[in-house]
Amino acid sequence: MSIYSKFTINDVLLNKESLQKKNKYTCPICFELIYKKSIYQCSSGHYACQECWEKSLEIKQECMICRCKVKSFKNLSRCLVIEQNFSKKECNCIYSFHLDYFIDGANQENEDEENEDEENEDDEDENEDEENGEDDEDKDEDEENENENEENKDEENEKRKLIKDEENGCKEIINVDQLDRHIQNCKFKFVKCSHIGCDRVLRLNSLKEHENQCGFKLVKCEYCACDGIIQVQLENHYDECPKFVIGCPQGCLNFFERDQIKSHIENDCNNSTIQCKYYEYGCKVEMKRSELQRHLENVNHQLFMGKLIDKLSSTLDQSMKIQELLLKEIEKSKITCSELQRKNDELSSLITEIDDNYFNKNDFINSWKLTSQGYTNKWIISNYSNLVENTPHPEYIYSPSFDIVSREFVISIYPNGSLTGKDHLSLFLHNNNEDPNKLEFTLELVNLLDKSKSITRKGLEVFEEIERKGWSKFLASKLINKKNGWLSDDDKLTINIYVKILYDDIEPLES
């Protein structure tokens, strides 16, 4: 049985000649070693591999050796002693051999696959020949060719010999039952370099060193910081790298980064050919930049300078005219800006006036609503239970004040009763104004569990200046709790408020 690609247990087993002579660990039917085979025995102790037993019992229900009756495979017993003893035999690791054997084996496997394909094609041809009624002589020739191919394979397998890699191979001796796990973890296994383009195959324990030096590893350019460059192509990259330092191609002996060379040649290099500064005005001489100063000193450029002065004067005149036009446009813009600012101020004043009228109108509407419909709100008192404990009879607390048409009012509550209402909740409406007011008012203690049980008290009174009116015995204090519905789960008491200012009827005009 194959343990890795083309390898068999015979390739790595130690003392295999001795084991084969004893025939103790070989199936007596198929003559294969019992590596990774399930071994079963008859009642007389004769054993063979599971595959051989199954094939034999399909033909005859008897032992292949002693001929004792075996009705079915279920009548056999597992021969664990033989299996366990063989699993403890020693063997070499497959990676103790040279790489050449792995490569040759891989090539041989490819050849075997090709031969199988050819055989399949031959079989198809044979079927076609039979259908077409060809002679049996062609079949005999094909069979002879197949036999020759098999003989050639056997000869090639005999020629292939495993050669130990004494210097770099795995030297560990392991038990048969540990072979698969060792192969998976062996540090001497053959692996391929992970870098794309590198076909190098080497042992795992030398992979890291190789990959650090591999010509196909990706590196970063030290000049332009470009990454993802293959090591062997780095020199080619330097030929194009914009930050690689090179000498001036015009031989001025200065060095610059490649992307700065163009600017150097156009603006600074003494060996660059340039035109005389008066070239546009008639001096058509070209020279190296280093010779410009000597040219200017040795050649009379007065005529050319005169042309330059004339051109500059003309340009200056045009600039002055443009400046005058721009100044006029600026003055026009200033006038326009002033006019726009004035209109903006007018609009701002108009907007302010509209806003004032709007708010005055809203105030009037709100005052009218309060006058005609009355003031409606609610007073929610938090932590009422603590308030009862901390406000003894006859102390009280005030609600936040509220205004009705510029008149101030407030509600007072006595949790434990006023002077005349001990052990009761007392509620009063206070007129905090110096003028008397005729008021229609309602105070309602809200029952949160059943709104129909809410207690409402109504009054129609004339309040003199700084006076209160209300009820000293609104509800017994001991009844106000969560169970009865007067307090919420978070201990809040709610009082609804309604107050309306009443005015005397206007008397008719008489004459």
Swiss-Prot record:
Keywords: Coiled coil, Cytoplasm, Metal-binding, Repeat, Zinc, Zinc-finger. The keyword Nucleus does not apply. One of its GO terms (molecular function) is zinc ion binding. SUPFAM superfamilies: RING/U-box, TRAF domain-like. A zinc finger (TRAF-type) spans 181-234, 236-293. Residues 107-159 are annotated as: Disordered. Residues 374-499 form the MATH domain. Belongs to the TNF receptor-associated factor family. A subfamily. This is TNF receptor-associated factor family protein DDB_G0290931. It comes from Dictyostelium discoideum.
